[in-house]
Design a protein with these regions (language model features):
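Nucleotide/pyrophosphate-binding catalytic subdomain
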Residues: 1-210
């Protein structure tokens, strides 16, 4: 019989992991075989150490039989790119007012830069992630988001036009389930598309909760 001798550091690592798994065992038993949606914020992914740990944890969740579905944000990264392009943006109720020029940058940052990086990070740590962008193949059908605000002086309510900021009307769950069935971890960029082919920037928390 062949024995593998482990270094002290590897032993400590395995002991720590075993301890973590022991603590998580009730949760694992409760959610084994279930699909869970995890929102991954832009601030967290900006820290290399946190990003690596997140990827490792997602791989571990998949290994124990739970199916993670990642919906990511990207606010800080979008802000940095807009600043680089000398494009000024305003926020209302935490939502970025998004014109046609801005939405193209938002789409690139979310679907091409951030999404691909998360998929790569998960794959590098041993997971099998698959990239999805909500505005491709009608994954996330959307409509323009309308929010009502009251004028402070007159108390009159008016509808604010946020541009290409949307909300989901329908999510094509079938495509995501096919990915999970293939053993993949879906990673979704929070973009949507309407019946006229317009792309919308959607809040990641809204997509995760849809």
């Amino acid at each position: 019989m062949k024995f593998n001798f482990l270094s002290k550091s590897v032993q400590n690592y395995l002991i720590n992991k075993a301890s973590t798994l022991a603590e998580a065992l009730p949760y694992i038993r409760q959610h084994t075989g279930k699909n869970i949606v995890i929102k991954y914020g832009g601030h967290a992914m900006g820290d290399a150490a946190l990003a690596k740990k997140f990827s490792q944890d997602i791989g571990l969740i998949k290994e124990v039989g739970i199916n993670p579905i990642i919906v990511h944000g990207g606010g800080p990264q979008i802000g940095a790119m807009l600043k680089k392009k000398n494009i000024k943006t305003k926020f209302v109720e935490g939502l970025r007012i998004t014109d046609k020029k801005t939405v193209k940058i938002v789409e690139k940052v979310l679907s091409k830069d951030i999404n691909k990086k998360i998929v790569s990070d998960i794959n590098l740590t041993g997971g099998k992630a698959e990239s999805f962008s909500g505005n491709i193949n009608n994954l996330i059908q959307a409509k323009k988001l309308k929010i009502a605000i009251k004028e402070s002086d007159s108390n009159i309510e008016r509808i604010l036009d946020l541009g290409f900021v949307g909300e989901p009307t329908k999510i094509n769950i079938k495509k995501i389930l096919i990915s999970i069935k293939k053993g993949k971890i879906p990673v979704i960029a929070p973009l949507g598309i309407d019946k006229n082919g317009n792309t919308y920037n959607i809040n990641a928390d809204t997509v995760a909760g849809a």
